[in-house]
Amino acid sequence: TDAGVSGYGCSWAIEFAESMGKAIIGEDPLNHERLWQKIYVPKFIGRRGTSCKTVSAIDIALWDIKAKVAGMPLYRLLGGFRERIPCYVAGGYYAENKGITQLQKEMEEYVSWGIRAVKMKVGALSLKEDARRVQAVRQVLGDDVKLMLDANCAYRFFEAIEFSRMVEEYRPYWLEEPVDADDYD
């Protein structure tokens, strides 16, 4: 900033970051939402993949600047007040030769560590196969462990609805990124 405050955000896409950064040089870094809209909405190089990761890096740098200017840690600037925060383990990823039994063993191991919430990957197999995976995981987790699902934008709108109905009885705590945020169809 012109006041000498630097914000840091990581991105391996230096060229994208430099291009987007030029669009906001000279702007008030505390006007965060306006700057975010300025680099995200015009679709500099698209709104997926590398471009989106670069917007995220700039966004993180802007939050870093805000916290430094305010003279406080970012969690406090965002209203944080807790002494403890809940956590979960992300797992259940697809791997060659990893079937239902291996998936169940993985989830059982997390529970043996004292974990009370797990997130698993869905979206790379058919809806029916992924629903079977969710059912199998719920069987080993029992009712007291939260189960979250992450599709990483794998579904079209109607597939997401269908999959949600298929797994509803297994009580997922949430279904993360079922569809692409920019898919308006």
Report residues per predicted region.
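Glycine-rich, aromatic-flanked loop segments that form ligand/cofactor-binding clefts
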Residues: D59-A95
